[in-house]
């Protein structure tokens, strides 16, 4: 059961990473969702 859970988590992580790579580069704050900011062409979560 733990092996299946780990496999699913890894699959989700890979899917998210692939999705982030395919997203076009952002140019300003309005292109990112709430809680994120545009930095170096990518929407990154705001820390702090």
Curated annotation (Swiss-Prot):
The modification Leucine amide is found at residue 47. It comes from the Eukaryota. Expressed in salivary glands. Highly expressed in the head, body and tail with a 2-3-fold higher expression in the head. Residues 1-21 form the signal peptide. Keywords: Amidation, Disulfide bond, Secreted, Signal. Transmembrane segments: none annotated. GO terms for cellular component: extracellular region. Residues 22-27 form a propeptide. Does not show effect on voltage-gated calcium channels, potassium channels, and tetrodotoxin-sensitive sodium channels. Does not show activity on Nav1.7/SCN9A, and shows very weak activity on cation channel TRPA1. Belongs to the annelide toxin family. This is Peptide HSTX-VIII.
